[in-house]
Amino acid sequence: MIPVVIEQTSRGERSYDIYSRLLKDRIIMLTGPVEDSMANSVIAQLLFLDAQDSTKDIYLYVNTPGGSVSAGLAIVDTMNFIKADVQTIVMGMAASMGTVIASSGAKGKRFMLPNAEYMIHQPMGGTGGGTQQTDMAIAAEHLLKTRNTLEKILAENSGQSMEKVHADAERDNWMSAQETLEYGFIDEIMANNSLN
């Protein structure tokens, strides 16, 4: 069930679902697994807010275990495409594809709550049963290209070398907020809401 917020206006009361009300304040919630329909919703909100006023920041709250690489990269590409700065605020966790999205916020405007976690690892893929050897080779090559793409983005976002990101993402690598800050994925740990 989605909560409803009631506001007093000059014409009486107006009710909003909570997400529509947050959108009025340029807040987008990116929660749950990253998949196509969620990505489409986030992208539509980014485009809407940018068209509404590209001089004002957009606030993207992130709490995700990750998910689809293509859906996540569509969000990242849109964040980079629009003119408005996207501030990212990690709450709970940003894992896997979530780290790529959260670290792609505007430099100097990437935040994390004190008890949130980050996790990087190499992308996963599979070919399913009954797959021909040639298709398996194609899938393996694609997975290597995908890993390179993601590690390049993470290296650019953190200021770390590709080699370090590659080594650190070999297995699940969980980071506290402090470790994430030291790595360079975020710019500040927020104990209270001081966003501009």
From Swiss-Prot:
Enzyme Commission number(s) of this protein: 3.4.21.92
Catalysed transformations (reactions): Hydrolysis of proteins to small peptides in the presence of ATP and magnesium. alpha-casein is the usual test substrate. In the absence of ATP, only oligopeptides shorter than five residues are hydrolyzed (such as succinyl-Leu-Tyr-|-NHMec, and Leu-Tyr-Leu-|-Tyr-Trp, in which cleavage of the -Tyr-|-Leu- and -Tyr-|-Trp bonds also occurs)
GO annotation terms (biological process): protein quality control for misfolded or incompletely synthesized proteins
Keyword Protease appears in the UniProt entry: yes
Gene3D superfamilies linked: 2-enoyl-CoA Hydratase, Chain A, domain 1 (3.90.226.10)
Any one GO cellular component localisation term in the record: endopeptidase Clp complex
InterPro entries noted in UniProt: ClpP, ClpP/crotonase-like_dom_sf, ClpP/TepA, ClpP_His_AS, ClpP_Ser_AS
Keywords of this entry: Cytoplasm, Hydrolase, Protease, Serine protease
Protein name per the record: ATP-dependent Clp protease proteolytic subunit
Gene expressing this chain: clpP
